[in-house]
Amino acid sequence: MHVCRPFILVVCALASIGATTMKAQAADVAAETPAPDAGQQLHAMLERYFEEWLQLNPLLATFIGDPRYNDRLPNSIGPEHRAQVRAMNERYLAEARAIDVAKLSPADRISHEIFVYERERMRAAERFPDHLLPVSQTGGLTTLMPALGSGTNAQPFATTRDYENWLQRLDGLVTWLDQAIVNMREGIAKGVVQPRPVMEKVLPQLGAMLVAKAEDSTFYAPVRTFPEAVSLADRERLTKAYTRAIEGDVVPAYRRLRDFVRDEYLPKTRSTVAWSALPDGEAWYAHYVQEHTTTDMTAAEIHQLGLSEVARILGEMDRVRQQVGFDGALEAFFTHLEVRAARVPPPAARGRRSRRRGRGRAHAGAGVRPAARQTRAGRRAP
């Protein structure tokens, strides 16, 4: 079809004018829309960080009552997860430093300072191989997961979905237990091992997980008490699934770890107990001190501060002893106070005694002797 050239030129011109107008309007709208201020940037960043942190640490989500990730258990001591945490930390540290602190409110400045401090502390911690010490007698997934799987902890077991979520978490536990062996072998090679007394206490904890039948396992407890929300068909299916998981996956994984600790790791444990005895241990311990106290004081300085504070407080107590006229040493004064405290009736008894005194005063004011003070003859008198 033939179209005259002048018409085409007119159409193109109109289109160009329209496009230019639209761009100008868009620019005007952008100019009218204010950029988020520093406070809004900070709040949005903190919200995003918390959400991403929950995804990387789903157990935290469970413990704070957020059920979205109850089916997840990452291999937190594995290289991939540790790399994800490291990358996330660096990304948010850079974003936080880009915020104009001078434009923040006083409260937001504190939030910003704390956030940056925590990111810097996490970066500093990368120097120290905590992941090579994944198992101890006081913590770690080896003891936490049985507690969660007992059905009496933060992990919910109220619906069919809850039961299925836990099965998926058990898969993650098996992966974690095997990763622990890999990491601890690396720790042996690098001289980063637990003290022997610690692992001697770990062995019976691991041994307690090695049951012959699923019914004897802590992890079996939830299927003993299904809630009404779980149908009979699902109960039967889930009971079989839990039995398979416990006997076929979880118990064998615990056995592998127990055997490794007993046969390979325990002979390589250290006779020392101080953290400073580890490779780079002095700096490692100093890092922990700073992390838990948020000061730049050394361990020796903190220890000395504690000694001086105890001396100061004891001096104050001794002045009180002198003020009340107690004739004896300070230790005897402490004993005296404990004995006196033991003789003080509990609040309920003091309240009853006070009410009795109050009734007595009321009777006396009305010309009536309290019953406790009347004689038998008086009570019989008209």
Predicted regions and their residues:
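N-terminal maturation segment of proteins
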Residues: 25-382
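Bacterial N-terminal signal peptides
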Residues: 7-18
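N-terminal secretory signal peptides that target proteins for export/translocation
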Residues: 1-4
